[in-house]
Amino acid sequence: MLNTLMLREWLRSMLRSCISKIFGDLMLISHISLSDKITLLTYGCNFKCKYCFFKPLSCKKYSVDEILNKILEVNENYKLDKILIAGGEPTLQNDLSELTKLLKDEGFYLMLSTNGYYLKDMLDKLEVDEIHIDLKAYDENKHIYLTSCSNKKVLDCISYIGKYRDEFNFKVEIDTVLIPNIVDLDEIEKIAKFLSNWDLPYRITGYVKYNNNLNAEKPDEDKILKAKEIALKYLSNVSCSLDFKRHKKSKKVII
């Protein structure tokens, strides 16, 4: 298992290096959507999550200046002041930090949604207001089963942010999808215990069946509330998908 993981890490590193060399100052963008905020979805991910719902069929290559101009053009009709950068996995984009700087200079409130795998190495360069890290599982074997990737770098990144939290100028939240019989109540408790070292904000979202890659069903409301109750034994700030709808209905803009 160790040799296999090392090979995977090497291949991922080589792939990321190749992407950087090929695209240079270009970013791969699928589309943007608009509701109470602009959501910019980047293309590509280093994880292969079994329950991933984001399967774009195409993307385009844009420089950060072109992306900024497109956002400003589209936003003329909406006058929104918040932008969520998600994916895919945004941290695969070579010029993410440059894009965040340009958007902040325009006065936008920036949120980044990431799996946290490559995040630690770019924390000092990003100019964002919020970072949401999706921790799939605390147990490494479960994480590998769900994503085909180890969670060691993700846990290390969360630990680093927790330790130096007061030195960063962004809010942070850790998110987990509650998946019955896989990432169940016992796993939620392990994650909550881990996060309690720094009392990081935690959000639990109920799994929604998108494909047949997981032998799992949507958790009922009682289970979601129980998961929240368990997490609150260790953390002061816990929310769940029953508390409010985070994503309002949006209009897709293909760019």
UniProtKB/Swiss-Prot annotation:
Its cofactor is [4Fe-4S] cluster. It is an enzyme of class 1 (oxidoreductase). It comes from the Archaea. The keyword Iron applies. It catalyses: glycyl-[protein] + reduced [flavodoxin] + S-adenosyl-L-methionine = glycin-2-yl radical-[protein] + semiquinone [flavodoxin] + 5'-deoxyadenosine + L-methionine + H(+). CDD domains: Radical_SAM (cd01335). S-adenosyl-L-methionine binds at Y51, C52, F53, G88, D134, L135, K136. Residues 30-245 form the Radical SAM core domain. Gene3D superfamilies: Aldolase class I (3.20.20.70). [4Fe-4S] cluster binds at C45, C49, C52. GO terms for molecular function: 4 iron, 4 sulfur cluster binding; metal ion binding; oxidoreductase activity. Its EC number is 1.97.1.-. Transmembrane segments: none annotated. Binds 1 [4Fe-4S] cluster. The cluster is coordinated with 3 cysteines and an exchangeable S-adenosyl-L-methionine. Keywords: 4Fe-4S, Iron, Iron-sulfur, Metal-binding, Oxidoreductase, S-adenosyl-L-methionine. Belongs to the organic radical-activating enzymes family. This is Putative glycyl-radical enzyme activating enzyme MJ1632.
